Amino acid sequence: VLTAIAEIVPSAPIHPLPLGEGRGEGVGESHAFDHLFPDSLVDSELGEIPKGWEIGSLGDIADHPRRGIRPNDMEPTIPYIALEHMPRRSIALSDWGAADGLESNKFKFKKGEILFGKLRPYFHKVGVAPVDGVCSTDIVVVTPCTEEWFGFVLGHISSDPFVEYTNAGSAGTRMPRTSWSEMARYRMVVPPENVTKAFTLRTRSAVDRIIASIHESRTLAELRDTLLPKLISGELRVPV
C-alpha cells in the first residue's frame, strides 16, 4: 500500500521496503509481518476476506471532529487551506494561505489530520494537514478513532473506490457535495488492530517524511524569494 501512496505523491518517492545495504534487508523485514495475515479466506458480503477479519464501516474507525471557528476568533496569520490549495490525487498539501480577511466560519484542523474535499469529490482532493490551521467548510476533517487506524483510514479515503463511492452519493447537480454521514457509511473489510498498528507504523513514518519535505521546500522558497531580488539589484554579490 505504501507503493500506492508513492504513486499519488510522485514528488516524494516512498520505498515499499526499507533500503539498507541492499534490497534483501527490506525483504527480510517484510517476512516479519507474514504472521499477521491468516492463511485462509472466508465468505462475506464483500466477497472473500481473510479469516478473522470483519466487515465494518468507515464510521466505525474514524470520526469528523466539527471544530467550528468564527472569523473574529481566528488569528490573522493562522494557516488557511481551501479547496484551491489542495492538489488532485496527492496527499501532500504543500500550499496554504492565511486566515487574514476571512469572513465566514471555518473548521479547525490539527497537523497530521486528514482533509477530504467534499465539493465535487470526483476532483479527488485528499491530503494530510502539514500544519495546524483552519479550512473551508467544503473540506471534511477526518481523524481515526485511535492512532492505530491512521494508515488504514488514509489508505481508504484517498483510494479511487472511496472517491467513486462519495461521488455516486453526492447531492446536487451543478455543485455536488458529499457529507460525513455519507462517507461514514462506506463499507469495508476491517483487519485486526495488530495489522493496522503495523501498517500505521510504516504509513505514518512515510507521511512524516512528506511533511518534513514540504516544510523544507517552503523554507528554501522563502530564502530564494528573499535573496533573488537582492542579487538582481546588486545589493548582494556572489564571490567568483
Question: Which sequence ranges carry the predicted segments?
Answer:
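Non-catalytic DNA-recognition/assembly elements of restriction-modification systems
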Residues: 16-19, 25-27, 32-69, 193-197, ...
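Residues marking the start of alpha-helices
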Residues: 45, 49, 174, 186-187
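A short beta-sheet element
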Residues: 105-107, 111-183
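Amphipathic alpha-helical coiled-coil/heptad-repeat segments
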Residues: 1-11, 147, 152, 159, ...
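Sequence-specific dsDNA recognition surfaces
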Residues: 39-44, 59-70, 76-111, 122, ...
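Proline-centered turn/helix-capping motifs that create local helix->coil transitions or kinks
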Residues: 9, 13, 66-73, 165
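Short, well-ordered beta-strand micro-motif
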Residues: 82, 141-143, 187
